[in-house]
Amino acid sequence: MDAGMLLPIFSLPSSSGRGDFSQAEVYLKFLRAAGFSYWQILPINPVDAYMSPYASPDLSAGDLLLLDVAALEREGDLSTLGQVHYGRKIDALFSHLKLKKVEARMGFQNFMNEQGERVVAAGLFYLASSRYGPFRNWPLEVKKDFYSFRNAHKDDRRVRIYCALSYLFEKQWKRILECAQGYGIKIVGDLPYYPGIDSVERWMHPEHFLLDETLEPTYVSGVPGDGFSDEGQLWNSPVYNWKALAADDFAYFRKRIDNALNRYHCLRLDHFRGYEKIFHIPRGEKPAAGHWEAVPGEALFAPWKKDPRFLIEDLGFLDEEFYRFRDKFSWPGMGVMALEGPRPSSRRPQIYYTGNHDTDPLPLYVKKMDEETRRRWREVMGGEVNTENLLDYAVHRQEETVFFQHGDFLQTPGRINRPGTCRGNWQWMLPPEAINDDAARRIKLCLRERAK
């Protein structure tokens, strides 16, 4: 059995209030010592106002909050900044960056030759957002004419700084990938399905979404009632215009996928059900008013049909049509203990998870478990329902790969996200002692003993 650990980079220990790249190499060393083969992270694109990486203002950019400030200081890219709280980090980076020094580097020039169009667009969106606020408040002429705004402001100092910081982000991330390879750890990335309601994608390519004449959504995203919410969930992102996306052979989406495959060793496709059909909710209505629309997912993924680097999130409202679509690909699906309980799912997943970012880690799962679920677990395990026995169950399912949440191994873990809520999510962090040598030995021994 190969073991993987699920932990967002923002959950790494940090004194700034939010994890970043500064502890990534330490964590990779910890994972190797603990016997893990995979590190699954959440998206590393910019986050929304609620810190969610799944409602990003730019699905292709990097989250500048993740930059390792101390490393930038050591390499002379920043004037001395010192400790800074994450809430002030972006402003501090903009004011302390040695812009001309970074721009003079051959690496930066090569980066801009390869990715300049995308990165400049991201910088322009940052500039316009700081000037006008939420997209709905932008002047209509700015909303509807990205290219005129670009021509007028592409050389603005703030846009140039954004491009330079984006280069430094990719440089730091490349170093982390190389470190992971050196430790024999594969990093599993995550491809969100939708951008957020305010996004550079909506501004730069409005034809890719179902929008009205003022570029406001006619439909928004969400899901009907499911195991997370009886009334359904309203995600509120503008929905894709799949006819328009298909008309140019999915160039936008395929470029996103190619970029993600270059950024990670393996790639999880979030909300894979959305590539077979997707739920449309009329703007201003509740999820109950929504309906399903077909999506040409088989054509979209044709170039990667046999590519082994993908895994898919096949959770939520699933039907026979979805399973027929899913089974046209060779990619493993997911089974999640905290969602399925002791009964296996209707198909055998190739990757098993104790939980994901939307569920409690095992100690909290046990603590909150209702009596009926506890009774079913006792029948299956023939003993007490506790974290240790659930770890036994996960290890002995005979799956090729099992993923754990780091919180499964902690006395007082926290939860990453509660679906259907906005506040208090995407903030949980590991205590520093959770990734020391003793912790690695304990986890390695724990899994080794259970694998016997």
Listing of model-derived features with the role each one plays in the protein:
Residues 168-182, 186-187:
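Active-site pocket-lining segments that scaffold enzyme catalytic pockets across diverse folds
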Residues 423, 440-452:
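C-terminal accessory segments of extracellular proteins
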Residues 188-192:
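Gly/Pro-rich turn-and-neighbor structural signature
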Residues 27, 176, 322:
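Aromatic/hydrophobic pocket-lining residues that form π-stacking "cages" and hydrophobic walls in ligand
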Residues 6-8, 13-17, 50-170, 194-413, ...:
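Alpha-amylase-like alpha-glycosidases and glucanotransferases acting on alpha-linked glucans and related
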Residues 36, 185, 331:
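Short glycine/serine/threonine/alanine-rich loop segments
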Residues 1-23, 29-35:
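Mature N-terminal, pre-catalytic/accessory segment of carbohydrate-active enzymes
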Residues 23-47, 262-266:
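Catalytic domains of carbohydrate-active enzymes, especially glycoside hydrolases
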